[in-house]
Amino acid sequence: MFHIYHSYVAKEYIKATEAYLTALKTASPNQAPILQIYNNLALCYESQEFYLPAIKTYKESYATAEKMQDKYGILHATRGLGNVYAIQDEEEKALSYYQKALSIAQSIKDSLWENAIFCDIAKVYDDQGLYIEAKKQIDLALRYAPSNINLSPTYFWKGSILYNLEETDSAIHYLSRASTKANIYTKASIYQTLYEINKENKNYEQAILYNDTALTCYDSIQKIIHHTEINNLIKKHSIYI
């Protein structure tokens, strides 16, 4: 079942990649839709772990956005490059691109992008084991977050970072806050982390409950993705941030 599921997803990404490559051939080189096609194509490559084509495509998107003087296009491509390098554990390159993206977001005073990029930077520091610096960045993400967005992902990352800092009570507080409005994907990670915390604290009964809930979330995710059709996949990739 695991092999069939991943084979299905791989085929859908191949179809999406082919669709975006076809769209590039007919897209006008001086209009905004081409930037979205580039970025969605890069994301498809990234999702298939084709990192060199992803980087090449994001750079093409960046160059096109520069010619068009489209700051949001430049911002999206720059953050995309940071994401690809972060996935490959090339932290210094990732941080360099994230800092460039953050400067652009601050210049256009877009707090939604600022929140997202501060979270990106926090994750890199967290992966490096620099938990105090990660906490500073996630606090900035919360400070700059617009009042009308769902903060569940940010709360989750703050809880995870606090867990790594061994501030267990504070970690549980933020993870619990994250769970109230989280989507199924974030909930799976939240309950998995709460399971690990309770297991370490020898609260085995509570740990089992969290583990069962996490497994239920993972099962639901598998069913959702397994039944995803190509048009839904393309819609997912059309989200700009």
Question: Over which residues does each language-model region extend?
Answer:
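Hydrophobic/aromatic packing residues within the alpha-helices of TPR/SEL1-like helical repeat arrays
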Residues: 20, 58, 62-65, 98, ...
